[in-house]
Structure formats: C-alpha cells, structure tokens
Amino acid sequence: HLQTLRFSKNNKRYIDDPSITGDDGLSEPRSILEKIKKSDIKRHHQADKVRKEIEKSPYPVILCGDFNDVPNSYAYTHIGKGLINTFVEKGSGIGNTFSDLASTLRIDNIFSDPRFHVEQYIRIKKRLSDHYPVVADLVY
C-alpha cells in the first residue's frame, strides 16, 4: 500500500463541487495541492524501495497492491518495469479500481514476473471498501 493522498471530507467536497470555497477562496485548492505534492514525493521513495526488493528477489515476483497512483505515474512505471501488468494482459475497459472521487482511477495493481502466464484478470464490482477487489489467475 503506497502513500495515500489523505484528502479530508472538505477536500473531497471541493473536488466534487469546485464552486465551494474556503474563507479566503484558496484554502481547499491549496490544501489539495499540498497533499498531492507530499504524497507524490512519499510514493516516489516507496516505489524506489519496492523496486530494489523486486531486483533482489531470487524468485519470480508477483506484486499486488494499492499504488494510490495512476498508470502514467512514476510509482507505477518504476515498480512495473520488466513485469507483466495483469490488467493490460487480460483486463478490459477502463478497469477502475477506486470507487470514490474520480470513478475512472485504476490504482490497484497486480504485476507478475514474465515467466507467469496470465489466464484471467477480473475486477469484482462489489463495494467492500472504497476500492474494488481485483483477481488474476496466473500459471507458472
């Protein structure tokens, strides 16, 4: 689980309706931008650590998790380098995994060593939390 944004209820309300303003009209946008910046820096460092562990592993890697970041992010591309993305192999559509805020975010991932064959990838559209579960069947 990589660093979350930690948006407050007010942050989320503002994102849903930007016409809402704070006392000075700038407090919510500033708060949101600060949280995005701080969490991005933390995810960058976390991604570097995860990548080092992947490279040290003497075994074929399967990596599953909530990246809290989108497919064009540093965390996603750095961690996923040289691995198979099970959604790309067998998923379909947008494949959103996060149900709050923007419903198009795919931030939960399953990556595998290329020696695995991806039989199927499924996103279960059941709201058990603010994320939809994802499942991949892999064959070695």
Please state what every model-predicted region is:
Residues I41-I62, F67-Y140:
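Metal-dependent phosphoester-hydrolase catalytic domains
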Residues H1-E53, S57:
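Catalytic-adjacent loop/helix segments of enzymes that bind and process anionic phosphate/sulfate esters
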